[in-house]
């Protein structure tokens, strides 16, 4: 070991499987550690320590917890400094660099320019070891010598190399030679960094008692970000002002690994060391640097604007690089195409490129744009979005954005730091407040953008081997990469913060089979992270997930308990569109209800709304189930492990492989490549290759496409197969085609019947007659036709519809139905439907008018709670009292606008549970009905179709008519008989004595020519057999008139 060093130390590069243990160099171990069994690790600049056990030269127990807590990763270079008493100070120097302080206090550049080969000695480097001669390039020696000589000549200059640890801890430690030579004391609490011109920033300067060094904190990360510097880049600093507040002039240069290319002329007053270092950077280039190079500038306060400055010979440049902060703030992180829009409205399609270093740039097309618009010197572009396509629009020199930027520049000049020292403290405070406001604004915009572009209640988890544990976040979503080695799973802070998960307790994991598992929700005080307890591993195994699999969890709430529900693979977040979905895609994915209730729009943009009622949650679950059914997800239940459903996708055809369900393959021990037979319904066998990829996924290979063509399977179709065994050879026997997505088949049936079925099932009204086939018996299930299921689903939805559910379809978004509950009366608020408020842009508190049927207006407040739920406040109870609306009553209102003022107009009271009203009538007839009350004569009733009947997709029948004919207690099926003798199925439901004609009414009216406002007669046909379905015979006014004459 080097005797001149204060503390002995060694270095180690983290390699795969570093979590399990760490090997101490042999000479270091024999001199300091040998014979000891316990040591203590302490991260630099932290008071917390970890106790680890020593097993010979290995650090074992406790090491894993240490690296996980401090987020060590593969490739990081870690320094271990032994301070005595079996205590190590550990420093993470970031990837591919190591730091050795020289006894003369030389610049860090000498140490970081040497790239060390860590492949030998398990990645360990001791102080006493010499670097291999072949690794010391000539350029490195020259650079290090230049730095050494320059730094010794002028102690007012130093170079700061940016490491990943610096950015993580938001600190920069100043070299000892610099702080000691320039007389820094603990009275120095602030430091000013300036480029010698307009830009400057005030940062905190602190002293580290443990190491005896000064460091910059609280703002270093933002300073690097604003100057486009990442890990590996470096700054050249020169001391230009002393006193209580130090002033450093800086010059950002390119990174050592070539990530950035920011050029500027050196200031005349910079020291010789800066000049020599800049010369070193110039010598490193393989191509001589031209006199001019393009660069883009960016202002944090105007994140949509980017300004390009071009050199005279810009024609030689192939790509035009975009500013790193600009692309990061605006979420432009994927290659593709981008449009350049000039001042005449013309669009220029330009390629958007992404290099291996993560730099985004404009490719082919930007030069033509520059030439056509005479922009040879430079120009400013504004980012706008057309759906998911970015567009850069050319800004004129007189644009508001330019004037705003000039004002900002002037404001910065006014706050220049090179003024009267007496005003320095005042300026520092102003700058601090300004910086803090900028940070708050940036955080607000980032939070808002991420909420809009991503599904904040979703988190995607990828299971990797133990060596690849990391947590990463992107602009589009929350992504966690975890290892099954760990007992708990840390959740991303963005995910927990956005969803308000900040307290330890219990959380429920909901599997794909509907099985719930309780696990602990833990809180780590050290880093403020929330994590799932050890029960998450059982959840992963029970749902057939293994190393290499990715799965998405959706956060839902059951009362106050968070629930993470497992989403199927095809319902994962759409990342390619930035986490969102276009309206076109939404419309395509919306489920269509039967014609009786037209099209009901569901919120597929899935935003977590904790204010939804329980019936909304049930509705969402039913829609999810319907979506899974139509998409053809795996239907293999755990009790039917021998059955698997396969779906032909474009990826299957392109890669010539048909993936088997992981659960199916695991439960049937199909885990090795080989051969498998496919048996079709005609008894023909097809020998198919069975493949296994690197992730362990099993799939059908060569031969399956011929099998599919022989059985007339097309793209998008699904079919079910049963696994049987012939000796030791597996065989998949075809059962039937379950789903077909071709448009030609959609009109008939989603499922095609098996070839052996003699005829399709007979479907008439509410009766279906299927034929039981051998395949049905073998599969232990019977598939009902989709037409028949549609009728059942329509009746179920109509029943839920009449139980108090919101009745406003997407085509009638201006209608909303309220139900008065005891909670509404107690809290003096009437909640607006979340869908109604969203579709009508009612999202801000204020006032609204309630318009009754007499034309009177009632001014009512509109409230918005913490969860974003909109409701009617003060004034609605007076309105309800006037209209004699009581608890349990429901009424419908229509939203209209008077200029910019919203007005809710009362249509009618729909249902009432008040016992006092049962004897009379449950609903109030609207004034728009032609007659004041329906005409009831014996078994005839005359009605008029109103707008409310069309809106509700049903007709309310008077209770007097039902009682007079003794059918007020006959609920269920009913038949409507048209004038042409055609029978139409209907359904009668009861709500506290009210009988409604629901299913089939709209189609019946259209077929019989009943129009809005037209009077018609329904006749009850007296059936002698009370067990049969009641019949209502329809007669139009014209028919009645002819019969009378």
Swiss-Prot record:
Species this chain originates from: Arabidopsis thaliana
One annotated Gene Ontology cellular component of this protein: nucleus
One matching Pfam family: B3
Keywords of the record: DNA-binding, Nucleus, Repeat, Transcription, Transcription regulation
Compartment annotation: Nucleus
Compositionally biased region (Basic and acidic residues): 130-141
Region (Disordered), start-end ranges: 121-147, 423-449, 606-625
The protein's name in its UniProt record: B3 domain-containing protein REM13
Gene Ontology molecular function terms on file: DNA binding
Highest taxon, organism lineage: Eukaryota
Record-linked InterPro entries: B3_DNA-bd (IPR003340), DNA-bd_pseudobarrel_sf (IPR015300), REM_fam (IPR039218)
DNA-binding region, residues: 7-96, 157-253, 305-398, 474-570, 643-738, 815-910, 940-1035
């Amino acid at each position: 070991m080097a005797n001149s060093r204060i503390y002995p130390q060694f270095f180690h590069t983290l390699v795969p499987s570093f979590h399990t243990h760490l090997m101490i160099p042999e000479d270091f171990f024999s001199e300091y550690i040998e014979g000891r069994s316990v040591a203590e690790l302490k991260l630099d600049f932290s008071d917390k320590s970890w106790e680890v056990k020593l097993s010979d030269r290995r650090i074992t127990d406790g090491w894993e917890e240490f690296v996980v807590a401090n987020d060590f990763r593969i490739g990081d270079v870690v320094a271990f400094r032994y301070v005595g008493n079996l205590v190590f100070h550990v420093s993470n120097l970031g990837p591919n660099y190591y730091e050795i302080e020289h006894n003369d206090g030389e610049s860090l550049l000498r140490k970081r320019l040497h790239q060390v080969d860590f492949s030998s000695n398990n990645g360990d480097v001791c102080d006493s070891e010499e670097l291999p001669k072949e690794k010391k390039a000539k350029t490195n020696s020259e650079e290090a010598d230049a730095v050494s000589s320059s730094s010794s000549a002028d102690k007012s200059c130093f170079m700061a190399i940016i490491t990943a640890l610096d950015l993580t801890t938001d600190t920069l430690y100043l070299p000892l030679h610099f702080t000691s030579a320039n007389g820094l004391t603990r009275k120095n609490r602030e430091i000013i960094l300036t480029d010698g011109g307009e830009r400057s920033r005030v940062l905190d300067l602190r002293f580290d008692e443990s190491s005896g060094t000064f460091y910059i904190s609280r703002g270093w990360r933002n300073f690097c970000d604003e100057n486009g510097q990442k890990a590996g880049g470096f700054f050249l600093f020169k001391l230009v002002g002393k006193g209580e507040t130090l002033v450093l002039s800086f010059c950002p240069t390119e990174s050592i690994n070539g990530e950035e290319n920011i050029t500027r002329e050196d200031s005349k007053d910079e020291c010789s060391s800066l000049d020599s270092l800049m010369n070193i950077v110039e010598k490193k280039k393989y191509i001589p640097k031209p006199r001019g190079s393009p660069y883009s500038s960016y202002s944090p306060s105007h994140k949509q604007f980017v300004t390009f400055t071009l050199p005279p010979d810009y024609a030689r440049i192939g790509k035009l690089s975009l500013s790193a902060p600009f692309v990061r703030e605006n979420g432009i992180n994927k290659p593709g195409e981008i449009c350049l829009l000039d001042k005449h409205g013309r669009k220029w399609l330009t390629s958007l490129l992404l290099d291996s270093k993560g730099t985004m740039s404009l490719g082919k097309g930007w030069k033509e744009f520059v030439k056509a618009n005479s922009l040879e010197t430079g120009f400013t572009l504004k980012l706008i979005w057309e759906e998911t396509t970015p567009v850069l629009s050319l800004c004129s020199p007189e644009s508001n954005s330019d004037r705003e930027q000039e004002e900002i520049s002037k404001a910065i000049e006014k706050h220049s730091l090179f003024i009267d020292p007496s005003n320095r403290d005042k300026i520092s405070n102003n700058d601090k407040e300004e910086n803090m406001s900028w940070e708050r604004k940036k955080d607000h915009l980032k939070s808002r953008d991420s909420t809009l572009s991503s599904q904040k209640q979703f988190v995607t988890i990828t299971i990797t081997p133990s060596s690849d544990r990391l947590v990463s976040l992107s602009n589009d979503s929350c992504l966690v990469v975890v290892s099954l080695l760990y007992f708990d799973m840390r959740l991303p802070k963005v995910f927990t913060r956005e969803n308000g998960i900040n307290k330890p307790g219990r959380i429920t994991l909901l599997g794909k089979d509907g099985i719930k598992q309780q696990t602990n929700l833990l809180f780590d005080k050290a880093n403020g992270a929330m994590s799932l307890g050890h029960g998450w591993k059982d959840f992963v195994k029970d749902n057939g997930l293994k190393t290499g699999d990715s799965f998405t969890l959706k956060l839902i709430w059951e009362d106050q308990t968070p629930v993470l529900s497992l989403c199927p693979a095809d319902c994962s977040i759409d990342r390619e569109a930035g986490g969102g979905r276009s309206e076109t895609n939404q419309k395509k994915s919306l489920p269509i209800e039967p014609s009786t209730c037209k099209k009901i729009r569901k919120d597929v943009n899935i935003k977590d709304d904790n204010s939804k009622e329980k019936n909304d949650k049930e509705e969402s679950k039913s829609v999810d189930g319907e979506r899974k059914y139509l998409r053809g997800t795996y239907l293999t239940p755990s009790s039917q492990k021998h059955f698997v459903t396969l779906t032909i996708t474009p990826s299957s055809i392109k890669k010539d492989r048909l993936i088997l369900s992981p659960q199916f393959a695991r439960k049937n021990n199909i885990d090795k490549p080989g051969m498998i037979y496919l048996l079709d319904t005609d008894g023909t066998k097809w020998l198919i290759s069975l493949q296994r990829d690197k992730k362990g996924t099993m799939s059908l290979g060569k031969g399956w496409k011929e099998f599919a063509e022989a059985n007339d399977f097309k793209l998008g179709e699904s079919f079910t197969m049963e696994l049987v065994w012939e000796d030791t050879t597996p065989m998949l026997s075809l059962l039937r085609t379950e789903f077909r997505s071709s448009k030609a088949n959609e009109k008939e049936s989603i499922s095609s019947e098996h070839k052996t079925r003699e005829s399709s099932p007979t479907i008439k009204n509410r009766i279906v007659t299927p034929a039981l086939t051998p395949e049905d018996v073998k599969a232990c299930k019977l598939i009902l036709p989709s037409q028949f299921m549609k009728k059942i689903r329509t009746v179920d939805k109509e029943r839920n519809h009449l139980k108090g559910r919101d009745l406003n379809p997407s085509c009638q978004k201006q209608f909303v139905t309220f139900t008065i509950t005891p909670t509404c009366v107690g809290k003096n608020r009437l909640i607006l439907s979340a869908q109604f408020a969203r579709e009508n842009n009612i999202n801000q508190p204020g006032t609204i008018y309630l318009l009754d049927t007499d034309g009177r207006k009632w001014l009512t407040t509109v409230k918005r709670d913490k969860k974003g739920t909109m409701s009617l406040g003060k004034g609605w109870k007076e309105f309800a009292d006037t209209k004699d609306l009581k608890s349990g009553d429901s009424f419908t209102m229509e939203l209209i606008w008077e200029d910019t003022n919203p007005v809710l107009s009362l249509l009618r009271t729909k249902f009432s549970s008040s016992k006092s009203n049962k004897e009379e009538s449950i609903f109030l007839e609207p004034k728009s009905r032609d007659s004041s009350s329906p005409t009831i004569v014996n078994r005839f009733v005359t009605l008029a179709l109103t707008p409310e009947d069309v809106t509700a997709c049903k007709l309310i029948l008077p209770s007097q008519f039902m009682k007079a004919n003794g059918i007020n207690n006959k609920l269920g099926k009913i038949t409507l008989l048209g004038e042409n003798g055609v029978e139409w199925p209907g359904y009668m439901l009861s709500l506290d004595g009210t009988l409604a004609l629901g299913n089939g009414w709209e189609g019946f009216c259209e077929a019989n020519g009943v129009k809005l406002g037209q009077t018609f007669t329904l006749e009850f046909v007296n059936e002698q057999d009370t067990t049969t379905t009641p019949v209502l015979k329809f007669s139009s006014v014209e028919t009645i008139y002819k019969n009378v004459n």
